[in-house]
Amino acid sequence: MKSYDVIIVGGGPAGLAAAISAKKEGIDSILIIERDNQLGGILNQCIHNGFGLHTFKEELTGPEYADRFIQQAAELNIEYKLHTMVCDISHDKVVTVMNREDGMVMYQAKAVVLAMGCRERPRGALNIPGYRPAGIYSAGTAQRLVNIEGFMPGKKVVILGSGDIGLIMARRMTFEGAKVQCVAEVMPYSGGLKRNIVQCLDDYDIPLYLSHTVIDIEGRDRLTGVVIAEVGPDRKPIPGTEMHYDCDTLLLRSEERRVGKECRSRWSPYH
């Protein structure tokens, strides 16, 4: 069984930064395990600029920012495996992984770093009534479809949730020729940066409805429209405030859930 001082699960920005820092502290035997086909994680689909101002003192796109870390990891000869899924981590830090080239392999680690990022909450967690037609995506999924896969989810879009990715996707869909009808936010304030509200919504005359949510989804095979309504302090819809929008695409931007949040851990007073 091959051994490593540190095994890092996840090759996104956090995993790369952890590996680079560990290497600079004198730890030689490091392995990054990434299930995707490239390092960089979520940064690869964030093609807008605004990254790198604090770390590199210049404005970069997401892929450019990721590439800086990938180059540093390469210069430090940090080992990594792509297309590799972690199946199990035992109490004695034996990491079991699987990929097409090696099959199932076990590695012994002295320390394991979990840097697996976050996952968007699905529609089912948002309690939106209606059928399940095609055309409903998380904002992150739509971002990957447009920026990496080269597919347009639809032509008439409503976005629920005003986090930064939701705001950025409103602008991105507009760039690609879609009509973004509105952005609705259940909270009385936006979850995104003021800069993104101005640059992604105000500059393109996209309305932002605070204290509003989607209360109905229309369509059987394909989404045909949504109904949004104002909500009170209890987040319940206020009768008489309903607005109908024809659309073929609904993007959901909700609170992210950390991957591995339920991993059991035990505090050690010696570390």
Task: Please state what every model-predicted region is.
Residues 1-262:
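Residues forming the flavin
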